[in-house]
C-alpha cells in the first residue's frame, strides 16, 4: 500500500472534527445547564444588594438619625428586589434577571446591559419619590416632592435614558441587518460571560465597548450620589456629564457600524512544497486561498472550523484541519489550503469560501488543467 499524504491529512482532520464535535456538544449541554441555574445566583445577588443597602443605611444613620428618606429607599429596594426575583423565576431557563440583556448569540449585550442599568436606576429613583410622597403628611411637602419630577430638574437624566434605550434598540437592528446582509459574521457562544461586556466575539477587548461601559458607569455612580444627597427629586445629572455619556454612546454606535466585514478572496495559487516543480493547477493539487475574514470571531474552535467549506466549481470541499500547538495552521483567517478534487472538470472554474458563520465570499476564477 502506498502512503498518501493528502489521505492521511484528511483522515486526521475528520477524526479531529468528530472529537471536537463531541466536546462541543458536551460544552453546549453544560452551558444550557449553567444558564438554567443562573436565576438562583442572580436572585441571590439582588437580595445581597438589598442587605448591603440596609447595612449602609443603618451605619450612616448613626448620629444623623433615621429619616423618612431612608425608609423610602429601603421600601423601593424591596419592591425592586421582589420584581426582579419574580422576573428571574419566569425567565429561569434563560438566565433569570440577565435574560433581557443576553443577545441572540448567547452573549451579554453591552448596549442592553448599560440601558438596563439606567432603567433600573431611574425606576428606583421614582419609587423613592413615591415612597416619600406616600409618607408625607403636609401638602407643602407633597407639592415639593411632585415638583421634584419636573422635566426642568431631570432633563439630563431623562435625555441620557432615552438615548441609551434607543441605542440598545438600534444596535440590535443594525447587527441583525448586517448579519442578514452578510456584512457581519456572528457565531453563537456556549454561554454568556461577564467579559462579553468589554470584548468582541473573539474575546479581545474593544475600545468602543470599554469606554461605553466606563463612562456610563461613572455617570451612574454620580447620579446615585445625587439621589442619596437629594432624595426629594430626580437626580439632576449635569449637562456636561450627560453630553459625555451621549458622546460615548455615539462612539459605541459608530464602532458597531465599523466592526466586521464580508470575507473576501484576494488570490488563489497552487500550493508548492519544497522540491516541487512549478506548474499549473491540476486536479489533486493543493491550492492556497488567500484573503481576509475566513474565520469569524469566536469560531476558533475545531468544531466551528470543521464547518468551513470551499466550493471548487460544482464540488464542495471541506477544509482539512491541520493542528499545531496553540491552534491550527489550516484554516486561518487569511489563508486556506484545500485539495482540488478529482471530480472537478478541467477548465475555468470558480472558487468560493463558505465560512463557519454561513457567509459566502466573492467568487474567484482559476484555470484547472488535467
Predicted features by range, described:
Residues 46-55, 112-132, 162-165, 209-223:
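Hydrophobic alpha-helical transmembrane segments of multi-pass integral membrane proteins
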